[in-house]
C-alpha cells in the first residue's frame, strides 16, 4: 500500500488536501461553495423586487416589496405585508452583519409602512380601531387592493413589528435612541396594539386559504408582544397590548395533538393539519438563547422535532422526485400533502426552511451544551443516529455522542439544501415552486420570499444568529387559557411620514344581497361614497361569499360609512375570462344613521341581467 505523505507543498498542496479529505468533507465543501454563490444571487434577486429602484418591478413605490415580477399565471405583482416583513427582517439582519448599503432600503420601508398603516382597505380603516391593519396585500404603489381575497390575515402586523424592532434595537445600541423612539416606535406600537386586540380572532393563514387559528400567526404574535414589552421598557414608553403575551403563549400550546403540530385549528377542512406553516413559525421565532423546553416551541423542542419528522415524511412518497430517498435524508418539501394549488408541488422556501430549522436546533443545543432525547423526539433522532437512546447527552470532545449527533443533524440539514441545489436552475433564480415529478421550476418567477428564505438559511449555516428576542424572560402561560383582549390605541406615525389622518364618526352598514353566481364570478358594491369607490369600478368594494349556500346565495360585506351620509349604490358582477362587468339595472339609496346610531343591514336581491362563465 502506498502511503500519502504527512505534508505537502507547492502546487501539490491542494491535491493533497483533497486526497486526505473524507468524501463527506468534500461534499460539504462543494455545498458551501454553492451556498456562497447562491446567497449573493438571492440577495440581488430580493433587491430587484423592491421599489423604487428594483430592476424587476418598475412602478413599485419606494420601500414597497413586490412578491414577484410575475403578472399572470399567477399574478403576484402586489406587495404583501407578510412577505415584505419577512424580507425586511432578512435585509435588516444582513445590514447588522455589515452590509451597510442596505440602510437606504430599510429607511424607505419604514416610511412606506407608516403610510400604508393609514390606507383604508376592504379589511377596514386604520382609525378608530386599527382593523385595517389586517389587510394582507396592496398595490405596488401602496394603494388599496379591492379584489376578493382571504382577509383579514393577522400575521402581518406581528411580523412587521418584529422586523422594525430588530432595527430599533440596532439604533439604540448605535446611539440613535431618538430615531427609534420618535420615528419607528409609533409604527411598532400600532402593530402591537392590533396584535393585543385581535390575536384571539380567527383569520386566514399564511397560505391565504384557511380561515382558522394559525400556528405560524400565533407563534409570531407571541414573539412580537414579548419583544415589544422589552423595547417599550428600553424606550421608556408604554406597550398597549403586550400584556396579552401570556395568554397568546397559553393558546400556542393548543396546536400539539400528541403526535405533531396541527397548523390550523378551530377549523374542519378535512386535512391532517400537517403543514410547512409549523416549520416556518419555528424558524421565524428562533432564539439562540432559548431553552429547549420553552413553551415558545423552539426548533430544538421535542415537539418541534417530532413534528418535523412526521411532516417531512409525508412528502417522501408523495412526490416523484423524492422516490427512493430514505428517512434521515432531506427531501423536497411542500406546503401540505393535500395541496392542489398549481398541482401541489414542493416549494423552495419550505425546503430551505427545513434546513434552517435543523441548523437552528443544532445551534441551540451547542449553546446549551446539552441535548435531551425523550420519547417524543426519539423517532426523529433514530433516523439520523440509530444508536441514540432516551437520555441526556452533554457536550464533550469531538468523538463524543453529543458531537456525533450534532454532526448528524447538520449533515441532515445539508441534505435539504442539496435538494434545493439540485432543482435550482443554473442562473440561481428562485421561483415559488418546483415540479413534483420533474423538478422544473414553476409558478411565480423570482419569488422574493424564496430569495429571503435562502439567505436566512445561509446565515444560520454560517453561524450568524440574530440577537435574542427575550424568550427566556417571557412570562409563563397561565394555568387556564382565556380568550382575552386589550383594546388598542392607534395613532398615525407622522414622524415617519404617515398622513395625519383623523377618525370620523362611522356606522357599520352590512350590505347583504342574494345573487346566484357561478364559480369564478364575484360581486361588488359600488356607490357615491369614497368607501364604495365613488362610482369607480376599480375601487368598488368586494363582497364575500363565505355564507353562500344553495338555499341562500348570500354575498355580504360590513362596511363602516360616515354617519349621516346619504348613500347611492348598486351591485356589480365581475365575470370570468375578461368578460365585461354586469351592473344592476336599479340604483339604491340608504341614509347612514347619525353618530352613535345602530348598525344597519340591507336585505337586497339582485335586479338585472346575469352572467355566465366564459369557459376559458
UniProtKB/Swiss-Prot annotation:
InterPro entries, per the entry: 6-hairpin_glycosidase_sf (IPR008928), 6hp_glycosidase-like_sf (IPR012341), Carb-bd-like_fold (IPR013784), CBM20 (IPR002044), CBM20_glucoamylase (IPR034836), GH15-like (IPR011613), Glucoamylase (IPR000165), Glucoamylase_SBD (IPR008291)
Protein name (database record): Glucoamylase P
GO cellular component: extracellular region; fungal-type vacuole
Keyword check for Disulfide bond: no
Residues that carry a glycan: 200, 427
Keywords: Carbohydrate metabolism, Glycoprotein, Glycosidase, Hydrolase, Polysaccharide degradation, Secreted, Signal
Organism: Amorphotheca resinae
Domain CBM20, chain residue ranges per copy: 501-608
EC assignment: 3.2.1.3
Annotated catalytic residues: 205, 208
Subcellular location: Secreted
Enzyme class: hydrolase
Family: Belongs to the glycosyl hydrolase 15 family.
Reaction catalysis annotation: Hydrolysis of terminal (1->4)-linked alpha-D-glucose residues successively from non-reducing ends of the chains with release of beta-D-glucose
Residue numbers binding substrate: 149
Keyword Secreted: yes
Amino acid at each position: 500500500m502506498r502511503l500519502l505523505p504527512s505534508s505537502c507543498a507547492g502546487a501539490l498542496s491542494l491535491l493533497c488536501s483533497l486526497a486526505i479529505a473524507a468524501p463527506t468533507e468534500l461534499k460539504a465543501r462543494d455545498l458551501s461553495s454553492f451556498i456562497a454563490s447562491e446567497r449573493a444571487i438571492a440577495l440581488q434577486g430580493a433587491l430587484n423586487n423592491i421599489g423604487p429602484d428594483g430592476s424587476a418591478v418598475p412602478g413599485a413605490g419606494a420601500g414597497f416589496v413586490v412578491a414577484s415580477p410575475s403578472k399572470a399565471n399567477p399574478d403576484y405583482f402586489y406587495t404583501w405585508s407578510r412577505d415584505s416583513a419577512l424580507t425586511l427582517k432578512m435585509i435588516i439582519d444582513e445590514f447588522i452583519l455589515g452590509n451597510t448599503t442596505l440602510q437606504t432600503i430599510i429607511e424607505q420601508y419604514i416610511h412606506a409602512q407608516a403610510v400604508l398603516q393609514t390606507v383604508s382597505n376592504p379589511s377596514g380603516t386604520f382609525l378608530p380601531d386599527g382593523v385595517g391593519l389586517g389587510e394582507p396585500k396592496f398595490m405596488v404603489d401602496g394603494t388599496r387592493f379591492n379584489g376578493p381575497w382571504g382577509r383579514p390575515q393577522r400575521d402581518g402586523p406581528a411580523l412587521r413589528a418584529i422586523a422594525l424592532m430588530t432595527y430599533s434595537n440596532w439604533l439604540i445600541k448605535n446611539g440613535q435612541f431618538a430615531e427609534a423612539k420618535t420615528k419607528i416606535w409609533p409604527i411598532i406600537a400600532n402593530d402591537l396594539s392590533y396584535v393585543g386586540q385581535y390575536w384571539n380572532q380567527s383569520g386566514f393563514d399564511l397560505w391565504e386559504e384557511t380561515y382558522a387559528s394559525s400556528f405560524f400567526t400565533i407563534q409570531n404574535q407571541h414573539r412580537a408582544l414579548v419583544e415589544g414589552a422589552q423595547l417599550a421598557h428600553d424606550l421608556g414608553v408604554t406597550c398597549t397590548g403586550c400584556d396579552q403575551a401570556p395568554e397568546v403563549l397559553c393558546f400556542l400550546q393548543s396546536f400539539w395533538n400528541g403526535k405533531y403540530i396541527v397548523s390550523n385549528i378551530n377549523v374542519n377542512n378535512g386535512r391532517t393539519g400537517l403543514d410547512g406553516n409549523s416549520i416556518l413559525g419555528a424558524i421565524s421565532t428562533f432564539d439562540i438563547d432559548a431553552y429547549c423546553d420553552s413553551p415558545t416551541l423552539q426548533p430544538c423542542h421535542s415537539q418541534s422535532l417530532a413534528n418535523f419528522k412526521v411532516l417531512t415524511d409525508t412528502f417522501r412518497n408523495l412526490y416523484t422526485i423524492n422516490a427512493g430517498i430514505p428517512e434521515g435524508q432531506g427531501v423536497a418539501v411542500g406546503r401540505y400533502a393535500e395541496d392542489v394549488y398549481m398541482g401541489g408541488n414542493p416549494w423552495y422556501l419550505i425546503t430551505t426552511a427545513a434546513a434552517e430549522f435543523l441548523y437552528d436546533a443544532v445551534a441551540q443545543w451547542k449553546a446549551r451544551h446539552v441535548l435531551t432525547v425523550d420519547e417524543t423526539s426519539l423517532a426523529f433522532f433514530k433516523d439520523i443516529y440509530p444508536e441514540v437512546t432516551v437520555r441526556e447527552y452533554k457536550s464533550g470532545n469531538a468523538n463524543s455522542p453529543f458531537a456525533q449527533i450534532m454532526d448528524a443533524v447538520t449533515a441532515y440539514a445539508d441534505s435539504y439544501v442539496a435538494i434545493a441545489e439540485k432543482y435550482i436552475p443554473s442562473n440561481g433564480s428562485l421561483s415559488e415552486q418546483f415540479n413534483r415529478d420533474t423538478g422544473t421550476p414553476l409558478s411565480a418567477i423570482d419569488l422574493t420570499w424564496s430569495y429571503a428564505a435562502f439567505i436566512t438559511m445561509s446565515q444560520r449555516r454560517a453561524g450568524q444568529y440574530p440577537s435574542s428576542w427575550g424568550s427566556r424572560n417571557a412570562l409563563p402561560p397561565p394555568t387556564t387559557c382565556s380568550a382575552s383582549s386589550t383594546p388598542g390605541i392607534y395613532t398615525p406615525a407622522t414622524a415617519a411620514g404617515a398622513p395625519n389622518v383623523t377618525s370620523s364618526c362611522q356606522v357599520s352598514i352590512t350590505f347583504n344581497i342574494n345573487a346566484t353566481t357561478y364559480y369564478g364570478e364575484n360581486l361588488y358594491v359600488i356607490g357615491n361614497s369614497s368607501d364604495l369607490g365613488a362610482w369607480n369600478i376599480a375601487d368598488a368594494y368586494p363582497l364575500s361569499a363565505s355564507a353562500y349556500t344553495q338555499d341562500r346565495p348570500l354575498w355580504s360585506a360590513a362596511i363602516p360609512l360616515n354617519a349621516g351620509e346619504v348613500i347611492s349604490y348598486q351591485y356589480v358582477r365581475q365575470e370570468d375570462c375578461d368578460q365585461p362587468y354586469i351592473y344592476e339595472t336599479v340604483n339604491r339609496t340608504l341614509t347612514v344613521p347619525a353618530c352613535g346610531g345602530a348598525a344597519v343591514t340591507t336585505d337586497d336581491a339582485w335586479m338585472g341581467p346575469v352572467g355566465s362563465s366564459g369557459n376559458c
